[in-house]
From Swiss-Prot:
Protein's UniProt name: ATPase expression protein 2, mitochondrial
GO molecular-function term, one example from the UniProt record: RNA binding
Cellular compartments per GO CC: mitochondrion
Species this chain originates from: Candida glabrata (strain ATCC 2001 / BCRC 20586 / JCM 3761 / NBRC 0622 / NRRL Y-65 / CBS 138) (Yeast)
Alphabetic keyword roster: Mitochondrion, RNA-binding, Transit peptide, Translation regulation
Family statement: Belongs to the AEP2 family.
Compartments where located: Mitochondrion
Pfam families in UniProt: ATP13
Predominant cellular place of this UniProt entry's protein: mitochondrion
Biological processes per GO annotation: regulation of translation
Claim: Transit peptide is one of the keywords in the record: yes
Gene: AEP2
Function field: Required for translation of the mitochondrial OLI1 transcript coding for the mitochondrial ATP synthase subunit 9.
FT transit peptide: 1-27
Subunit-structure text: Binds to the 5'UTR of the OLI1 mRNA.
Length: 548
């Protein structure tokens, strides 16, 4: 009988023609995909008898026999194809991508070669796009491959123009790429959308422009990505400029993030400032919290705080407390964070941002403010080149504003002890510029925030570290200022168990004895200096008396 050499792809082709399910060592049959134009898997060829006149049952047995003799790599490749065949599970293939990148790419290439519709492919990629932990190298590579297929399918079926489905999907790709710090890939996705608008004869800022694309344009082209800002922290005393990132490691950094297009930014600003609600019945797309947040960040990045002030006055009229805002725009924590960041970058101080945030709290009740807002304030305060005493005072003002907001929202009482925020406060407090009056602030932090940790059934490692840091710091400062009785009262009140109380008491005794000994030594040394000076003066008087 004549022999014929076939590969894996031929097996799929044969199975499809004969309507025979192909099996491997995994559960269930392999879905029979259409023949692709290229060899799907590069495997060693295997020999089977010519089967043009063989019964279907016998043929199925022969194919199964050949599959059982394949290498482990071949079996894994077939497993990937079967995984894809089950409900078109692209999300499951994501887990294999790091193990066998090439095989996974070959597997998903089947979809494009099988002429799947853009609607079907969109449905298949949603579980992948909706995952929130896609930040690794292989995750980004997998997303990039899916995006390339998506773009190719869109050009094939839609001629390159984009509809509402394409806009939504591509903006999800952009969001994930930004989260994974893949700006080049995000720019590719954005450019595809912009080309799609052009293909339809539409303008991004026209009536068919969508909020997501405008927001991502401002992030990628106009400076709204705050995490990538280079912050100049040099002052008049520094000859060399130093740059930090707000969420970086507070070291000199280099960044290629620059403004690529400010034209559309200022078009939006002009439209906002010239808009007259009397002439229009509907609120324009730019009067959206997400877009306004990014516009304000962009203006802060390019140093246009005057325009930020104009926009705030136009929309919210903060100086007129009794006048309600004209427009139905929710003031969110992210919007307030953008305002503070924009002013901080331009003015090298959080002071203007604190003033504006206070005005918002006074005019608009029950603003929901997330911990990220307060954390962002403290980060700016630490980074900016203020005198350290000024940094302490501004940090204290942030704390007072936090308490004031808490009371204004009818949620008065305790402030949840956020570990990241309080660690930043501790960094400010642990400087050498703490004064006696600052002890009241430290005690206030215990009373209104750290107290929430004492009511928890169990504490995390980070919470225990935070609590002990504040306990030890407070005891050190109390001993330093000579408040021994208050220190003992503090230990009694704020130790969380017997062992902690004993540790703090032992620390107090050691520190007190050390400071007493040091002060005693200094007093003795000072008395020696005084006595020596007195003796020298006596000798001088005796000499002068003898001469006269």
């Amino acid at each position: 009988m004549r022999k014929q050499v076939i590969g894996i792809n031929n097996i799929f082709h044969l199975a499809r023609i004969r309507s025979i399910p192909v099996h491997c060592h995994c559960k269930g049959p392999l879905y029979s995909y259409p023949v692709v134009s290229k060899t799907l898997f590069h495997t060693k060829n295997v020999e089977v008898s010519k089967y043009s006149h063989v019964e279907l049952r016998s043929l199925n047995e022969q194919i199964h026999s050949q599959l059982t003799s394949l290498t482990d790599l071949n079996k894994r490749q077939l497993l990937l194809v079967e995984t894809l065949s089950r409900n078109n599970n692209l999300e499951k293939l994501l887990d294999y991508y790091e193990i066998d990148e090439g095989s996974v790419e070959d597997a998903i290439q089947l979809l494009q070669d099988s002429n799947v519709s853009i609607q079907e492919f969109s449905s298949m990629i949603q579980p992948v796009l909706n995952r929130t932990n896609l930040v690794g190298k292989y995750h980004m590579g997998y997303l990039s491959k899916l995006m390339q297929i998506y773009i190719s399918l869109t050009r094939t079926h839609n001629g390159g123009s984009v509809d509402a489905l394409n806009k939504d999907d591509m903006n999800k790709f952009i969001k994930r790429f930004i989260e994974g710090s893949q700006l080049k890939r995000a720019q590719t996705a954005l450019q595809f959308l912009l080309d799609g608008y052009k293909e339809r004869g539409e303008d991004l800022l026209g009536p068919y422009g969508d909020k997501q694309t405008i927001a991502h344009f401002l992030m990628l082209r106009s400076g709204a990505l705050q995490d990538l800002w280079k912050i100049d922290v040099s002052n008049g005393n520094n000859k060399k400029q130093a740059f930090y990132k707000i969420n970086g490691s507070h070291r000199n950094v280099k960044s290629t993030y620059n403004v690529l297009d400010s034209v559309k930014l200022f078009e939006i600003v002009r439209y906002i400032l010239r808009y007259n609600d009397k002439d229009n019945h509907s609120q324009p797309v730019y009067f959206d919290e997400g877009i306004l947040k990014n516009v304000i960040l962009c203006l802060g990045y390019v140093g246009q705080t005057t325009l930020i002030e104009d926009i705030i006055n136009k929309i919210w009229e903060l100086d007129s407390v009794s006048v309600p805002p004209k427009y139905n725009i929710t003031v969110t924590s992210d919007l307030l964070t953008a305002i503070v960041s924009a002013y901080s970058k331009c003015g090298k101080s959080i002071q203007p941002g604190l003033v504006i945030a206070d005005k918002f709290f006074g005019k608009i009740p029950n603003i929901i403010v997330k911990d990220d807002f307060w954390i962002n304030l403290q980060k700016w305060n630490i980074i900016l080149p203020n005198k350290w005493r000024s940094t302490i005072d501004l940090s204290k003002r942030t704390w007072e504003l936090m308490k004031s907001w808490r009371n204004s929202t009818n949620n008065g009482g305790f402030i949840t002890a956020n570990v990241e925020f309080l660690n930043l406060v501790y960094k400010v407090l642990s400087s050498d510029y703490i004064k006696l009056k600052d002890l009241e602030w430290i005690y206030d932090i215990f009373q209104h925030s750290l107290v929430t940790l004492y009511s928890k059934n169990s504490l995390t490692v980070d919470e225990i570290k935070l609590l002990k840091k504040f306990q030890i710091f407070t005891i050190k400062k109390m001993v330093y200022f000579g408040h021994y009785s208050k220190c003992l009262q503090f230990i009694k009140e704020w130790s969380y168990d017997a062992a902690n109380k004993q540790q703090l008491t032992n620390l107090f005794v050691v520190l007190r004895n050390r400071y007493l000994q040091k002060r005693g030594y200094n007093q003795e040394k000072e008395m020696t200096k005084v006595q020596k000076k007195y003796d020298e003066e006596e000798q001088e008087d005796m000499l002068l008396g003898g001469l006269w």
